[in-house]
Amino acid sequence: MAKRVQVVLNEDIKSLGNDGDLVEVAPGFARNFLLPNKKALPVTPTVLKQVEHRRAKQAEKEAAKKQEAIDFQTALTTIGRFTVKKQVGEDGVLFGTVTNGDVAEVVKEATKKDIDRRDISVPEIHGVGKYKVQIKLHNEVNAEINLEVTSY
């Protein structure tokens, strides 16, 4: 009896791999769990061709997303500076702080494009001034914007 069998995964499985990966598993695991639950397919030449085709399409999509992120990064640097207006006390200290949501809102107003607030890294801002803010646009593309905090 074979020690390991090869299967192609149909979905992401946490401890095993991602959709489309070719993995070696125990024959019982493949026979009793992966194959009956349609979480994997046995390896055949046809399945391997489908996997290659799917990977090529995925690579094209990923390249397009990366290019879009690079274009957006260029747009952000072209704009240069974003301004957030906050209420300030007499000594120049903000009431509250500048949050990721505030930055996302200002960027959306200027570029008409949504940014997930969780992808924005804002330093601790407690006063009026100029700050650098990091925005993660893609796994490999980050943008740094200049943020000016003013009073209203």
Swiss-Prot record:
The keyword rRNA-binding applies. This is Large ribosomal subunit protein bL9. The gene is rplI. Pfam families: Ribosomal_L9_C, Ribosomal_L9_N. Belongs to the bacterial ribosomal protein bL9 family. Keywords: Ribonucleoprotein, Ribosomal protein, RNA-binding, rRNA-binding. InterPro entries: Ribosomal_bL9, Ribosomal_bL9/RNase_H1_N, Ribosomal_bL9_bac/chp, Ribosomal_bL9_C, Ribosomal_bL9_C_sf, Ribosomal_bL9_N, Ribosomal_bL9_N_sf. HAMAP family: Ribosomal_bL9. GO terms for biological process: translation. Coiled coil: none annotated. GO terms for molecular function: rRNA binding; structural constituent of ribosome. Binds to the 23S rRNA. One of its GO terms (cellular component) is ribonucleoprotein complex. The lineage of its organism: Bacteria, Bacillati, Cyanobacteriota, Cyanophyceae, Synechococcales.
